Amino acid sequence: MSFANADTPPQVVVLGAGAWGSSLAYVLNNNDIPTQVWSRRSPQSLESMVAGADVIVSAVSIKGVPSVAARLEAMDLQRRTILVTATKGLDPETMTTPSQIWQAALPSQPIAVLSGPNLSKEIDQGLPAATVVASSDQAAAEEIQTIFAADNFRVYTNNDPLGTELGGTLKNVMAIAVGVCEGLGLGTNAKSALITRALPEITRVGLHFGAQPDTFWGLAGLGDLLATCSSMLSRNYRVGYGLSKGQSLEEILANLGGTAEGVNTTDVLIKIANREKIAVPITRQVYRLLHGKITPPQAVEALMERELKAEFEDFDL
């Protein structure tokens, strides 16, 4: 079925009523797409709400993905129901991405990843933005592109869901580092250098697991990295900024008003990097900082005093 040519619009259910889930529902409703939002506090059950849905958009936190996926796995979903994951994070138990969790739970369903430089508050204000829908099922990607595209929300497609997902997930770690840099008042030169060196670190991880290099130069990679590392609207950026001002991690998280997925992602990424022997120098300093092993100035010093090397060493695309 093509949503664009159908007599009636598709029925969509957004899982997760946080800032991001609410923003995605806002875009869909503005496009006259019938959309319901489910959360753990919803009076209606998850099962009854998604029964008959054409599209399910998951915007629950990474912590909630496995349990929600297990509940949908037990259902008999329509074969062409498309599952779109918009969660950014890594599961601490399995060290897998949200789309990998969903694919394991729903092997017969088309799975798509939605990610890009999309700060939810700007989306809610109707400011222009662009995003990426990635899937190995091109038809599914194009269907999701159709329902989300709007005058102020441009949607691209690609066929690299893993790279799209990793770009959106790993930049949260880098945003913590950039928040530290900004909070310490290290200047534009330092901030630019840090963001630039963050991109090959993200790409290195992605390529190790088979992602496509071009993905990281696009909206889900460089685009999301720039947005998240340039705005106090980013919760991960604010974590780093708060640490640079002497606040404890516990204090920062308590006052954040939402989840900073970069904190959990840092821990999981270090485990993956250790297991796979992937160089992640920025992530290692963020990890040490989050666990109180070094101070913010010491983290900067450790990065600046690394062994000298060629710019594109161990970054062979």
UniProtKB/Swiss-Prot annotation:
Catalytic reactions on record: sn-glycerol 3-phosphate + NAD(+) = dihydroxyacetone phosphate + NADH + H(+); sn-glycerol 3-phosphate + NADP(+) = dihydroxyacetone phosphate + NADPH + H(+)
GO biological process, any: phospholipid biosynthetic process
Membership in a protein family: Belongs to the NAD-dependent glycerol-3-phosphate dehydrogenase family.
Chain positions recorded as sn-glycerol 3-phosphate binding sites: K88, G116, K171, D224, S234, R235, N236
Pathway note: Membrane lipid metabolism; glycerophospholipid metabolism
First-listed, main subcellular location of the protein, grouped into a coarse class: cytoplasm
Taxonomic superkingdom: Bacteria
Any single GO CC term annotated in Swiss-Prot or TrEMBL for this entry: cytosol
Subcellular location: Cytoplasm
Keywords associated with the record: Cytoplasm, Lipid biosynthesis, Lipid metabolism, NAD, NADP, Nucleotide-binding, Oxidoreductase, Phospholipid biosynthesis, Phospholipid metabolism
EC numbers on record: 1.1.1.94
Gene3D superfamilies found in the cross-reference section: N-(1-d-carboxylethyl)-l-norvaline Dehydrogenase, domain 2 (1.10.1040.10), NAD(P)-binding Rossmann-like Domain (3.40.50.720)
The protein's role, per its UniProt record: Catalyzes the reduction of the glycolytic intermediate dihydroxyacetone phosphate (DHAP) to sn-glycerol 3-phosphate (G3P), the key precursor for phospholipid synthesis.
Enzyme class: oxidoreductase
Record-given protein name: Glycerol-3-phosphate dehydrogenase [NAD(P)+]
Gene name per UniProt: gpsA
Taxonomic classification: Bacteria, Bacillati, Cyanobacteriota, Cyanophyceae, Synechococcales
Entry binding sites for NADPH: W20, R40, R41, K88, S120, R235, E261
HAMAP family: NAD_Glyc3P_dehydrog (MF_00394)
